[in-house]
């Protein structure tokens, strides 16, 4: 439903059983939760504030994802906060980007490619999702606004496509076999 009209442009059938999202807070106090999440995840979405770029928690998350060889994409969030941004969540992200004024597009590209440069310093090749030439070599960055919903369909399409292409076998489930789960955090309360 969220991907809407984007699904009609895809000719390949989706075969993965679904996606489960775990939200690991970015605050420094949640280091252990991020580490456990990075260890257990089949694929990750690293949410980055486009206005702030690379922060210490971002670097930590990148290192965790590398350590556990977890494939990931970047959601470059808060694009609606660029000065002059005209939100329109009723059209595809690429059309919305084209409809922005030149200075707004330039500011977004400047922030995005500054972040790409910081990723390169950490030995990650990254590119805006529509410019990725090889998803096995480059990290896709999808500009999004969690507030307006812009870019969310594209983000879901990219993560679904990557999961289907590279993780389809590991995402298979045996509904007749035993279940398996992981506890990320336990809080003991008396009373």
Q: What residue ranges belong to the model's regions?
A:
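Conserved alpha-helical scaffold flanking the Walker A/P-loop in AAA+ ATPase domains
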Residues: 2-11, 30-36
């Amino acid at each position: 439903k969220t991907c809407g009209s984007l699904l009609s442009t895809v000719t390949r059938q989706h075969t993965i059983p679904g996606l489960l999202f775990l939200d690991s807070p970015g605050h420094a106090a949640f280091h252990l939760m991020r580490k456990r999440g990075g260890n257990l995840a089949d694929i990750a979405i690293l949410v980055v504030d486009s206005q702030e770029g690379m922060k210490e928690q971002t670097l930590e998350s990148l290192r965790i994802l590398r350590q556990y060889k977890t494939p990931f994409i970047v959601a470059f969030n808060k694009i609606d906060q660029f000065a002059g941004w005209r939100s329109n969540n009723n059209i595809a992200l690429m059309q919305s980007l084209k409809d922005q004024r030149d200075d707004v597009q330039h500011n977004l590209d400047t922030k995005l490619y500054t972040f790409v440069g910081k990723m390169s310093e950490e030995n990650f090749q990254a590119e805006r999702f529509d410019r990725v030439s090889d998803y096995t070599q480059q990290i896709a960055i999808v500009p999004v606004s969690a507030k307006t919903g812009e870019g969310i369909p594209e983000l879901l399409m990219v993560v679904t496509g990557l999961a289907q292409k590279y993780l389809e076998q590991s995402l298979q489930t045996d509904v007749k076999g035993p279940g398996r789960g992981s506890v990320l955090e336990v809080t003991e309360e008396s009373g």
